[in-house]
């Protein structure tokens, strides 16, 4: 689930091993139209390439490797072909990255806060998702969702988002699966031991929701997607709560944890 596929050109230059930058949910089913009200679809000139999460009426959180020139965000989307009446489109007014992010490491502190050019309104298909209030426990049931590829090798992007349940695993499982990643990365490890269910190309920036709380952002994984014993890695949102809250409050110079 090497999430680094979303920004393929950029990441290929920096991370020859990163293959899952923008992955889709493999092994899932079509999401209920009302279960992804905070899910944001991100498009550029080539089409859909990443997801994000609506935190409030003005801010979206996604992966920093989802940054692209002239992208747009669509909120309230289910089918990419059929417009919802309450669907809203916004452009980025401001993009904020961790100021202490390592410039030579595209995967370090892989978060991007995007301020919308105008606020969105809550509606039948639009509602923000709060930051987590407590960290998740190993064994927690977690929900993944996105418009990413639904096939593990050949990229097959669906018209509607797919959802699936996976479990939060011990960090040691992912450390063993991905020894190339620095130990200081603040991540969560999630998947199913037998494989077959995973985020995949195009799912980057989307959420990992554990027991109803927004705990992770799709970050990194194996290619092909869904292979055992290589679960997905997700940026650990709660470790960045203070930074996110500070930026939203107006302190755009706030520093992320090391």
UniProtKB/Swiss-Prot annotation:
Protein name, per record: Snake venom serine protease HS114
Miscellaneous note of the record: Negative results: does not cleave fibrinogen gamma chain (FGG). Does not form fibrin clots from fibrinogen solutions. Has no effect on aggregation of washed platelets. Has minor effects on the substrate for plasma kallikrein, plasmin and factor Xa, and also on certain isolated factors, such as prothrombin, factor X and protein C, not inducing the formation of their activated forms. Also shows a very weak inhibitory activity on the human voltage-gated potassium channel Kv10.1/KCNH1/EAG1 (9.2% current inhibition at 5 uM).
Modification(s) after translation: N-glycosylated. Contains approximately 10% carbohydrates.
Tissue expression as described in the entry: Expressed by the venom gland.
Oligomer and partners: Monomer.
Signal peptide start and end residues: 1-18
Notes on temperature effects: Optimum temperature is 50 degrees Celsius.
Protein source organism: Bothrops jararaca (Jararaca)
EC number(s) stated in the UniProt entry for this protein: 3.4.21.-
Covalent S-S links between cysteines: 31-163, 50-66, 98-256, 142-210, 174-189, 200-225
Pfam families: Trypsin
